[in-house]
Structures are given as C-alpha cells and as structure tokens.
C-alpha cells in the first residue's frame, strides 16, 4: 500500500516538473522571465542565490548555494519531524501488521480476501495514527526545487560563470572530486536513515537503494554543474545531522513517556 502511494505521488511530481520545465527555454533568467516555470520556480531560486551572494563577504556564489540549501532544508524540518514520527509509529505497529499478514497469508489470488486484508490493514494504520504519505512530502517538494536550481545555475550568467574552490559552478568538476563526495555522503546519509526503517522488506529495498542511489548520483555528478552537486552534498550533510538529532529527541521523548 505504501509503495503504491509513493509510486503515484513520485510519478505525478516528476510529470509536474517535466511538463513545467518543458515550457522553459534557454533565455537568461531575470525578473521579466515569462511562463509559470521560469517566473515562479526558476527565477526565485536564481534571485535568492544572487541576493545572498551579494550580501556576504567575498560575494561567493558557492557559499550562497550552501546557505540557500540550508534555508530550504530548515524550512522543511516540520515535514521531516512528521516523517520521523510516522516511521516510529510504523515500527510500533509492525508486530500487529505481521500478525495480520500471517492471518491472511497469500492474498494475491483471492480478490475478496485481498480486499478484506487491505481494509483491516487500513483500519490498523488509522488507529495507530500512521500516515503513509508523511514520508513522501520531503521528496516531492525537493524535486521541483532541484530542477529549478539546475536551470537557475545554467541560465543565470553571474552564477554560471562564478568559481568556488577549484570548480566553475556552471561546469562539471574536472577532477570528479565533488561527485565522489556527493556519492559518499548519499551512501552515509542512507545508512544513517536505515536505522529508522521498519525491519523486513523495506530494509531489503533500502539496501538496494544504498547501492543504486550513490551510483546514480556519481554518474549524474560527472556531467552536472558543480553548483548542483554542491546542493546535493549540503543537503546530504544536513539530512544526516537532522536524522541523528531527531532520533535523540524522539528517544528522549519515548523514555519520558515510559517513566510517566
């Protein structure tokens, strides 16, 4: 059930991004850019990066991308908290879900049995306060931001032509150092996140993703603008820190509830 929810939402989100970005063009981005995608998605990201860069010492666009990423991720903390709490509830419900699964066995060949199983599972999740969509929102929100950032970097000359450390933000890292760091931080971030996942099938699925996602990031990072790879790295480090902090807070809350 969770997989179907996520698959539908992710597919719709990707379709939304592709449709809007398809209406985009290669013209430079500024306040007069037209079209929903350019005016309401790409330009605000471009403006934010330029505004921050012009108000910090050295006018570093690399630092501006890092700050912008931290601001966006900080604004998404309430969604991350909701996601974490949802996972904690799912863990608590796991024994009951396993009993339900054992009770009905293989329901793939019996439509009536399958309907009854899904009905009882939905009731159990509802009574446990688990929201199957809670874990999807951070991903769905990041998709248009990620795509808009790519266009903001590639179509804003001031950002595209600026340098940060050894790279040009509008070009791929010639030494492939940033893509390797992005792939490593993606792997570590997923490893840290794994401890919050319910044991069983989801863990096996995550183990596959732990190999596929870093490999995909590495492959894409070889050709992606360095500014975009910098966004990945900053986001990964923020998510790792956030997961560790939230885990400690939730564990403390759980301990206090047990003592009460």
Curated annotation (Swiss-Prot):
Keyword Transmembrane found: yes
Gene Ontology molecular-function annotations: membrane insertase activity
Keyword line: Cell membrane, Chaperone, Lipoprotein, Membrane, Palmitate, Protein transport, Signal, Transmembrane, Transmembrane helix, Transport
InterPro entries in the cross-refs: YidC/ALB3/OXA1/COX18 (IPR001708), YidC/Oxa/ALB_C (IPR028055), YidC/YidC1/YidC2_Firmicutes (IPR023060), YidC_ALB_C (IPR047196)
GO (cellular component) term, any one: plasma membrane
Transmembrane domains' residue ranges: 29-49, 52-72, 133-153, 164-184, 213-233
Highest taxon in the source lineage: Bacteria
GO terms for biological process, alphabetical: protein insertion into membrane; protein transport
Topological relation to the membrane, as annotated: Multi-pass membrane protein
S-diacylglycerol cysteine lipid modification positions: 23
Pfam families: 60KD_IMP
Lipidation (N-palmitoyl cysteine): 23
Signal peptide: 1-22
Cellular compartment(s): Cell membrane
UniProt similarity note: Belongs to the OXA1/ALB3/YidC family. Type 2 subfamily.
PANTHER family listed in its UniProt record: CYTOCHROME C OXIDASE ASSEMBLY PROTEIN COX18, MITOCHONDRIAL, OXA1
Role summary: Required for the insertion and/or proper folding and/or complex formation of integral membrane proteins into the membrane. Involved in integration of membrane proteins that insert both dependently and independently of the Sec translocase complex, as well as at least some lipoproteins.
Protein name: Membrane protein insertase YidC 1
Gene name as annotated: yidC1
